[in-house]
Each structure stands twice: as structure tokens, then as C-alpha cells.
Design a protein with these regions (language model features):
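N-terminal secretory signal peptides that target proteins for export/translocation
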Residues: 1-8
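Residue-level detector of intrinsically disordered, flexible termini
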Residues: 7, 20, 24-26
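Periplasmic c-type cytochrome electron-transfer domains
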Residues: 25-467
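Bacterial N-terminal signal peptides
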Residues: 12-22
């Protein structure tokens, strides 16, 4: 027989267990969204949406800029004698800010557990949030917006948000275009941004008809999540949409940003950088984490899924463009697969430095790259990729934390991007968190525990600039 006091004790324990279970379930529920779908039936008028989001814009941008300035030094400090392929100066120096009183050497000497326990992981090494993470979507640099508006009369400006990173940290614009089929010509862009209005004039006689049609499709705008004709858009006037080369300008990148479409809920989605299409022909994985196996798959995926945040329901409302695999997708990918890396005159046919052309610093940097730095474990010559994905387990260094409405929990497996032409495609890492090559060296020195000396770091940067 259970005594009253014992019964009371069991009741209390039972209630406590229920409360703990409920708390755990609530915590689990907080990690899930209420739904995987975006709202389709918008009852708010566009005029009201426009007024509300325009009024909120200054506060949103101010909060995000505070995050950027806390993470990194955004000043314009060009490197002497180091430029991209068409002459834009490279930014130099480590821009990620250290915790007060810390040095890079002291930090590198600590274990991941120590850094995590003492909250010493540099803010600039955390995942970088979207300029407005709860809203997300494509955001373009102003120079892309201005040139497309000038040439096509199409406006890529969002009324609710502007691009966040300063121009000096972005790729040169317009980017040069190199073709694997005509290496004798060098840059075939004539210094122009290729658009639907000038592609025929620039490429008729250089491409075959399939490639020319593929380029036309890559330059043709189609409706997208933020740029469409419905009331649920982020352009002031109804938009014809976005073209592939609005982000991949001239087959390279302009640094435009977005959120991955394959994660829910919203706060767990990762910011993504626009990657270059140079060297598509030697790559076997596409998408930073999706691991699509062909560029044909990715071209279809962009139109059907990524343009609409991975939501085919809302895509139906806004105007999804279904590409025909046997012709349109083939044409688009045939052009993408002849986009070449920029010239690297100091490299030999094996992708390594020619000692007769390289500086001593570059040669020392190559030794670090293939030795102590462990870089070549993943980035293998001649194109400096292994066409695999790797998980750096960055979550070893920090506790999960909310950063301006983005939940930072780690990165997961990420594609090994080619390093050929790396100097032409800042900022770095899949989400733009690293502004310079020096930042990148410090990041991997910490994550991989390689404990490079200051001179070794400088030499490694010199080598990567030569790739």
C-alpha cells in the first residue's frame, strides 16, 4: 500500500518528469519550423508591404553593419603590386578581429575545447548571416544593378535591402571571360558586361549555334522569389525576373548573396556566396552542400528550386520556368563548360610553380601548401580541388549561438572549390565570411591546427596569388 506522503512524492516526480519532457519537446520544436512552406495566399496589399518594409530597412541595415564591423576591419587597404586579372587591386591583411588581448599565435596554441569554453573563437570566423536573415533572398551589388538597368531597363534593386559588403572586397567588374576553346584570344569580353542586349554582337562567330543559344538562355531573366510580377516581390515595380548571369557575371561572380534553399527553419539556413563558373568542365560536384553530380542537374535545379527557395508550390504562383533537358539544359551547360580559369603564367603543366618564373616567397609558399599547411590534402593540383566534400567540424570551437537572427551551429560538409584563379574571386569560404586570403590562411591554420609561423603564412598567400 502506498502511503499518502509517498503518493504525493510520486505525483510530484511524475509532474516533474512531464514538465521536463515537455521542456525537451519544446526545445526540439524550437529547432523545427512550424511549416516547410512559404505563405502563398498573400492578403496584404503590395502598397502596404512596400511601406512596411521600406520603413524597416534603415534599422535592419544598421543592425547588420554593426555585426560586420564587430567581426572584421572593413577599411580599404590595397596590396602593393597584387591585382586581379584585369587590374583591380587585391585587399591585403588579416581583417578578422581578435578578442581583446589575444594574438593569433596564442589562439593557435589553444585547443578547440579551450577556445570553446572561454568563448575565444573570433567573431569573423563564425558563419556570416544574410543582410536580413529572416527575409533572405537574392541581393545584388550596386554596380550589377546599375549596369543591368542601363543596358536592359531591368531593375535588380530591392526596396527592402541593399548589398552589405564594400566594393573593395568583391570581384572585379566586369570580369574577363576566357574560353577553353579559344585560349589564343585571352579575354573575349571586350571589357563589357555580357547581357541579353549585346551577347550576339560579342560572340557570334566565336561560339557554335548551340553554345550561342545556351548563352542566350543564361542571360534571359525568369521570375524568382524576390523578382516577379506578383504582390509578393521585393522590387518596386513588377519584375521580369533574374538571369543566371545576373549573379555569375561574365561567367565569374559579382559576389551576390542568397540563402541555401535546402534547410529549414529559416534561422538555420546558410548564407551562400555566388561561385565562379570558371572551370566547370573539371568539376564533378555542384552546390556547396547539395552535391549535385552534373552541371545539367544544377542548371535545372536553379530554375525549378533555388530561384524559389526550394519551394515548388510558391514557384507555381510566381512563374517557374521548366527547362527542356534535351535541348535547353544541354545548350546552357555546353557554354558553361567552356568557361576557363584565368591565365596563370607561373604554373607548369602539372599546376605547380615553374622555379624559373616564381619568386622565392611563392616557392616557399608552395612548400607550405603541400607540406606543413596540409592544403593539398583537399586542394590537389592541377586545378586544386579533389572534387569531394569535407566537414571541418567548426562547431568544435564554439557553442551554438544566434547571430542577428541566424543560428550558428557549424557548417557541415562543404565542397572543395578549385583554387585556380582564387585571387579573382573574393570574398572567401562558402558564405563570404573571410574577406582576404590572409583571413583564409588564419582560419585554416586554426581549424586544422597547423601552427604556421608568420613568414609561412605570408608565403602561403604569395603562392595562392600565383594560382
Amino acid at each position: 500500500m502506498i502511503r499518502p506522503k509517498s503518493m504525493a512524492r510520486w505525483v510530484i516526480l511524475g509532474l516533474t518528469g512531464l514538465m521536463l519532457a515537455f521542456g525537451y519537446a519544446a526545445a526540439q520544436q524550437g529547432e523545427r519550423g512550424q511549416t516547410s512552406y512559404l505563405p502563398v495566399d498573400i492578403t496584404e496589399s503590395f502598397a502596404t508591404i512596400f511601406a512596411r518594409m521600406t520603413a524597416a530597412k534603415p534599422g535592419i541595415e544598421q543592425a547588420h553593419m554593426a555585426v560586420l564591423n564587430e567581426r572584421s576591419d572593413l577599411s580599404d587597404r590595397a596590396a602593393q603590386g597584387a591585382t586581379m586579372s584585369r587590374g583591380k587591386p587585391l585587399q591585403e591583411g588579416v581583417r578578422v578581429k581578435l578578442p581583446a588581448g589575444m594574438t593569433w599565435d596564442r589562439l593557435a596554441a589553444m585547443s578547440p575545447d579551450q577556445i570553446r569554453a572561454q568563448d575565444l573563437y573570433p567573431k569573423g570566423f563564425y558563419p556570416l548571416p544574410h543582410p536580413n536573415h529572416p527575409e533572405g533572398g537574392m541581393v545584388f551589388p550596386h554596380f550589377e544593378i546599375d549596369e543591368i538597368k542601363k543596358q536592359e531597363g531591368r531593375d535588380l534593386k530591392r526596396f527592402d535591402l541593399d548589398f552589405d559588403l564594400p566594393d573593395q572586397f568583391l570581384p572585379e567588374f566586369p570580369a574577363p571571360i576566357y574560353l577553353t576553346t579559344r585560349p589564343d584570344l585571352g579575354d573575349v569580353s571586350q571589357g563589357k558586361l555580357v547581357t541579353i542586349t549585346n551577347y550576339y554582337e560579342l560572340f557570334n562567330g566565336l561560339l557554335n549555334p548551340k553554345q550561342l543559344e545556351g548563352l542566350r538562355l543564361l542571360l534571359t531573366p525568369f521570375p524568382q522569389q524576390q523578382f516577379n510580377q506578383t504582390e509578393d516581390r521585393r522590387s518596386e515595380i513588377p519584375s521580369r525576373g533574374v538571369a543566371c548571369f545576373d549573379c555569375h557575371q561574365n561567367g565569374n561572380t559579382n559576389g551576390a548573396t542568397h540563402l541555401v534553399g535546402d534547410i529549414r527553419p529559416q534561422q538555420f539556413r546558410h548564407r551562400i556566396d555566388t561561385t565562379s563558373l570558371r572551370g566547370v568542365n573539371i568539376q564533378r560536384l555542384f552546390g556547396s552542400q547539395r552535391a549535385l553530380k552534373t552541371v545539367e542537374d544544377f542548371s535545372e535545379f536553379e530554375q525549378r528550386g533555388a530561384y524559389f527557395d526550394g519551394d515548388p508550390v510558391i514557384a507555381t504562383k510566381k512563374g517557374v520556368n521548366i527547362l527542356e533537358r534535351g535541348s535547353q539544359v544541354h545548350f546552357m551547360t555546353e557554354f558553361q563548360e567552356i568557361l576557363d580559369f584565368p591565365p596563370a603564367p607561373k604554373l607548369d603543366v602539372f599546376g605547380k610553380l615553374d622555379p624559373a618564373k616564381a619568386t622565392q616567397a611563392e616557392m616557399r609558399g608552395q612548400d607550405v601548401f603541400f607540406g606543413k599547411g596540409q592544403c593539398a590534402t583537399c586542394h590537389q593540383p592541377p586545378f586544386y580541388t579533389d572534387n569531394l566534400m569535407h566537414n571541418l567540424q567548426t562547431e568544435r570551437f564554439f557553442k551554438p549561438v544566434m547571430i542577428n537572427n541566424m543560428m550558428a551551429i557549424g557548417d557541415g560538409s562543404i565542397k572543395t572549390f578549385p583554387l585556380r584563379g582564387i585571387k579573382d574571386t573574393p570574398p572567401y569560404l562558402h558564405d563570404d565570411r573571410l574577406l582576404t586570403l590572409e583571413d583564409t590562411v588564419e582560419f585554416f591554420n586554426l581549424i586544422l591546427g597547423t601552427k604556421l609561423a608568420p613568414q609561412e603564412k605570408q608565403d602561403l598567400v604569395a603562392f595562392m596569388r600565383a594560382l
